[in-house]
Amino acid sequence: MQQQYNPSAIESKVQHFWEENKVFKAVKDITKEKYYCLSMLPYPSGRLHMGHVRNYTIGDVISRYQRMIGKNVLQPMGWDAFGLPAEGAAVKNNTAPAKWTYENIEYMKNQLKVLGFSYDWDREITTCRPEYYKWEQWFFTELYKKGLVYKKTSTVNWCPNDETVLANEQVHEGCCWRCDTPVEQRDIPQWFIKITDYAEELLTQLDNLTQWPDQVKTMQRNWIGRSEGVEITFKIAGSNATLPVYTTRPDTFFGVSYLAVAAAHPLAELASTNNPALAEFIREAKNTKVAEAELATMEKKGMPTGLFAIHPLTGKEIPVWVANFVLMHYGTGAVMAVPAHDERDFDFAKKYGLQINQVIQPLDASTWDFSQAAFTEHGKLINSAEFDGLDFNHAFNAIADKLESLGVGKRQVNFRLRDWGVSRQRYWGAPIPMMTTEQGEVVTVPLKDLPVILPENVVMDGVQSPIKSDPEWAKTTYEGQPALKETDTFDTFMESSWYYARYTCPQYHQGMLDADEANYWLPVDQYIGGIEHATMHLLYFRFFHKLLRDAGILTSDEPATKLLCQGMVLADAFYYTSPTNERIWVSPTQVSLERDEKGRIINATDPAGHKLVHSGMTKMSKSKNNGIDPQEMVEKYGADTVRLFMMFASPAEMTLEWQESGVEGAKRFLGRVWNLVYEYVQQPATQALNALELNKAQKELRRDVHKTIAKVSDDIGRRQTFNTAIAAIMELMNKLNKAPLESDQDKAVMAEALSAVVRMLYPITPHICFELWQALGNQQTIDFAPWVVSDETAMIEDEKLVVVQVNGKVRGKITVPANASEDEVKITAKNDANVAKFLADMQIVKEIYIPFKMLNFVVKV
């Protein structure tokens, strides 16, 4: 063993051993309990960032711990390799997306290996490889045959200059990112998967995910958005047309003062035929693509159509408006507006001078100022004919019954969730396996012709997809007749919705999944990833699992038993303002700092001498130039130090503030562990530990060791509070550093302690522990060593500390044998000099004893 801790030499040697011996290869073994630990697979952008490192370190700590407690662990890694950034990078670097992607994968894979993650690299998946997406294409055709896939027109961003579809990310302030042409909304046919058929199950089975964060489940519940209401049909005055609307508040039905339809609603189109102003308003509204998240804050605009609807119960005419806050693809594309009892309807009515009719009264019969705001809570009905006086529940049912009896309404359960649009008019994605014959028949590509291969050797012009601009690519045959292949590609969420299952059998070629392997390993026992994926990836992930179950391939209902959402990694951000008033962000690695005595930054400058503004700790990002390169940190401090800091600096679910001083502290700690083991192994051979021969100090130290083992086991295994586990090991190390190494039993206790410390640290800092384990004389590598188990008898205390009070004030602390009786404790307390002083000449009226914690003498004053 070298005297000096040299991370780079140790880490490269240990990593070579792991790779050569395939130490982490996972093989199905029905005699062992399996454990599948999975971190969300990365997009191969070119470089790992600290967010990746945190995610994967957490996963690796869990995986290594689970191996040590005897589980058969699968921890794979792969690449979510399709996606729009590759197209942009290909144009910018004059290369093909495939070449750029594969080069990035190679680079990032080496970065992962340098960090020492215990992956089974034989299971590596790259989602842009035909052998992967072949089975995705096949499954899509199976869903189509089951009626779970359909095609319909849907709105996209269209650049009229480039004549191409733009992703939302390519629209900047309403204009094309490339040519600055105003973007239009255009309806084109697109493919959808019926996730709505699974809405109820996706919602109700959230209750079974007891080990998922409540925040994620709440976000999914809100996204699925189940509501119970009534669909009401209004007749349009002077025509045979009708207008269905859905409401969850039929109790407010008598307060409807206008109806609002989406700009794309057929009634709006009809009304605009001879109304140029309305036609222009509709055109403008259609071309302003609004994300649902922006609806609440955007300016509400509308225009009357000139049409009137007949209220089914009062017969009154109600104006129909076109409004920019109504979305065609939600509900019926129309809403009934009750300004007195809905804030949005109220604001719109005030703006355009529409009626505000109160029909709900507060339950306490107090008055409400309807000139200021809507009353949106439940209450009692007024101004509602025979329904006056009813509360919400009774009114809901009574009005629904009446509408149903008249044939103008029906109770309905609605979901906010929409079907999943999987078509993308991009190149770098898996081709959709559908064809259209010369007769216009849409058919699936048969299995024998799969995969439909995406050509990789292409030239990107930055405008059109190469498979769309090449008329030859689409040409094919179906049953001997000419046909055209679909030139859209899949949404990249398709690949990441089932990759976790393919990891169980990546070399299986007879089908999508080997059911035996998949059902042995699945569900995933621990999934790790950011909470930003709560309503997209994590929902599709659950949906796909249910599709695979219903296809008879999988037997479980949910893809992952436990979910951990790691917090973001933050770093200091600094900038100066340029002469053109632009903020120039400077990397924190380039900043010279002065701090006050409390550690606060009082001055910051860059190498050019600019005085910098410190904008605080913010998420590491390219835009603020405050990302820290993991590779630089590994080269400077070692992978184990980076891993240790990542796990110690913050609880896993909380944000982590990157502080290089903390990284330096982690390196110093590992140096102390190394030095203590080095000091120990220089001693002559140790005798076996004999618990009966231990003196008081040795017993106390051994007790601390085993208490630490118990705490660390619970913190890592059950609570997943890795930072507190590390803190406990550090506290123990402080005691071990002060412990003598003189007698045989001193050394024996130290041997047991160091064996425990090295094993407890191994999941977090595996390279140094690999080396220290061998230095301690173990023949088998630590990768196959069992987790250290606490000894209950070692934790039993010979003595207990009891706090002694007189009239509630602490007057002494006594040490008593752990088996002392209550009377013995009281006698010892009364004999304590300080306690005796306060009891002298006093009459004790009561003695309150909490065993081995506290004794209180109540005396007459």
UniProtKB/Swiss-Prot annotation:
Compartment(s): Cytoplasm
Protein known as: Leucine--tRNA ligase
Entry's Gene Ontology molecular function annotations: aminoacyl-tRNA deacylase activity; ATP binding; leucine-tRNA ligase activity
Taxonomic source organism: Haemophilus ducreyi (strain 35000HP / ATCC 700724)
Motif 'HIGH' region, residue range(s) on this chain: 42-52
Sequence similarity: Belongs to the class-I aminoacyl-tRNA synthetase family.
Keyword Ligase recorded: yes
Classification via InterPro entries: aa-tRNA-synth_I_CS, aa-tRNA-synth_Ia, Leu-tRNA-ligase, Leu_tRNA-synth_edit, M/V/L/I-tRNA-synth_anticd-bd, Methionyl/Leucyl_tRNA_Synth, Rossmann-like_a/b/a_fold, tRNAsynth_Ia_anticodon-bd
